Regions:
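Compact mixed alphabeta submodule
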Residues: 158-221, 445-479, 483
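Internal glycine-rich, Lys/Arg-flanked active-site/core loops of soluble domains
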Residues: 81, 89-134
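Active-site or metal-binding loop neighborhoods of secreted/extracellular toxin and effector enzymes
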Residues: 397-493
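N-terminal leader/targeting and assembly helices and adjacent pre-domain segments
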Residues: 1-100, 185-269
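Active-site nucleophile-adjacent alpha helix/oxyanion-hole segment immediately C-terminal to the catalytic cysteine
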Residues: 63, 67-71, 263-372
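Papain-like cysteine protease catalytic cores
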Residues: 347, 351-438
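Extracellular structured ligand-interaction cores
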Residues: 109, 135-137, 175-179, 413, ...
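Conserved short secondary-structure elements within globular domains
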Residues: 115-188
Length: 493
């Protein structure tokens, strides 16, 4: 990640004053969000208050963007030598490594630990607000640190009403890595301890995250001491992220939407394109994901070839085996191409050629192009594991239909890897729509209504599916997944 980020900053196309480097931003935002979620898990708050927690996660993006803007500009200042010439990349990289080590190493660790604590406290505070009619006061609980600092010791045991001005001036969590906490109580309040200017919150921790949903305040040096252009660059990035989130389907959680927005930024950066508005099924389908595919046989009432359904075909005079075969064996690219087209990326599938990433995917690795929202490898629901759970020995057309309806129950887009009765296999798309319809969408070659091949439907898959399968066969929902950039080269743009 760091090398990619440094290459981006070094690039002549990147403008450190007006842009935010995407690789660093995504990594830091993800780390701070992980810290926040860890803090939420540690909280004893009974009501999850999802809207408030989502607001914290979004505000983490703002903090991360300001942090990256500071870091990238500190690095960019070292790009030129004393004569104004661009330094060789390796020399510059070595010179900026201390900045990187501090910002994404030591200091990010401190920010992570503090974010855990303050997210925990924010969730607790919301709970205190909800129950203040019963437990109107808060007690300052002493630090759990093995070596607690003395600066908060005078406040230990202090009890004040939750709405008391004291809590606006002093709180657990207003020191980096502070391990004091609060508890709600109906015990009587105690006098306010004496304090001095030395007891003021540390920079960046002046706010109450339980009130404004910000783990770090707007007075943090990344913002109060921001480099020129920072606010404009951050606002532009956040507007782009908000736009992408707003256009996503409501069958995704807010966390999934944020993760996909990050993934979209990385895809844009890797492909050097700008994502458009989400495509309709018709725009993404109708062989638009694989436009260079040419059918070897075409429907012809007088044709000499016939399939099991009685349809007649003749050879396509425009078919060139050398040219066209790679686009008939590239289904493992067509399926993700369709999914990314739905997001708004005008990508198409490359042909399957020896030694390519696509050839690797075609050898039982098709699902490796997808990751979970947290970046971990995504796992499909294999046909074999489903058979075992059901106590079945083998698949039948009826069982395939049962399997599809169970694993594709939620509205969404699903990639299917299926083995055929006659051998070989195929990767394709099943899509569950809001009205409950489950549709077989073939992104490699058109099977949409009016194509003449619309008889290739879900029932067709059930009838053609093999009775026994390799473990690589199965189904995975992919519209809520991230695309693995390791395989970005399988697309044309």
């Amino acid at each position: 990640m760091l090398r990619r980020a440094l290459l981006n900053i070094y690039s002549k196309e990147f403008h450190p004053a007006s842009e935010i480097e995407v690789c660093l931003f995504n990594e830091i935002w993800a780390q701070i969000n992980n810290a926040a979620k860890e803090g939420f898990r540690q909280s004893r708050a009974a009501d999850p208050d999802e809207d408030f927690r989502n607001e914290i996660l979004r505000n983490n993006a703002v903090f991360s963007a300001f942090k990256v803007h500071r870091m990238q500009n500190d690095m960019a200042r070292l790009l030129l030598d004393s004569k104004g010439n661009l330094k060789p990349f390796e020399q510059w990289k070595n010179e900026v490594m201390p900045i990187a080590s501090h910002q994404v190493g030591t200091w990010l660790r401190t920010e992570y630990d503090t974010a855990v604590i303050r997210a925990h406290q924010a969730a607790d505070w919301r709970q205190f607000e909800r129950e203040k009619d019963i437990l109107p006061n808060l007690r300052w609980v002493e630090s759990t640190s093995i070596h607690p600092g003395l600066d908060h010791k005078r406040f230990w045991g202090t009890i004040r009403p939750i709405d008391d001005a004291f809590w606006s001036e002093h709180r657990p969590g207003d020191r980096w890595n502070c391990k004091c906490s609060l508890s709600s109580t109906d015990e009587p309040e105690t006098p306010v301890p004496e304090s001095s200017p030395l007891d003021k919150p540390q920079k960046g921790l002046e706010n109450n995250p339980g009130k404004d949903a910000k783990l770090f305040s707007d007075q943090h040096p990344y913002q109060s001491g921001a480099r020129e252009g920072a606010k404009k660059a951050v606002d532009k990035l956040m507007a782009r992220i908000d736009e992408m989130i707003d256009e996503m389907s409501n069958n995704l959680t807010y966390e999934e939407k944020m993760a996909i927005a990050r993934n979209n930024l990385e895809i844009e950066n890797s492909l050097k394109v700008t994502k458009g508005r989400p495509m309709s099924v018709e725009e993404a389908d109708k062989q638009n994901a694989n436009p260079r595919h040419v059918n070897e046989l075409v429907l012809d009432p007088a044709g000499i070839y016939r399939d099991g359904r009685g349809n007649r075909y003749s050879r396509n005079k425009n078919y060139d085996r050398t040219r066209d075969m790679p686009y008939s064996i590239n289904c493992q690219t067509c399926a993700p191409a369709y999914a990314l087209r739905l997001r708004g990326f005008d990508v198409t599938a490359k042909g399957n050629t020896p030694g390519s990433k696509l050839e690797y995917l075609s050898r039982g690795h098709a699902f490796e192009v997808w990751m979970n929202a947290d970046g971990t490898p995504a796992r499909h629901v294999s046909i074999n594991s489903w058979l075992d759970a059901k106590g079945y020995q083998r698949m039948t057309p009826k069982r395939y239909m049962e399997y599809f309806n169970e694993v594709c129950k939620e509205e969404g887009v699903y990639e299917l890897c299926i083995g055929w009765k006659g051998g070989s296999g195929h990767a394709t798309i099943l899509q569950r729509f809001a009205d409950g319809e489950l549709r077989y969408i073939e992104p490699q070659s058109d099977n949409s209504e009016g194509s003449g091949m619309e008889w290739k439907d879900v029932k067709y898959l059930c009838e053609k599916g093999a009775s026994t399968s390799h473990n690589c066969r199965g189904v995975m929902r992919v519209d809520n997944k991230l695309f693995n950039l390791k395989f970005i080269e399988i697309f044309d743009v």
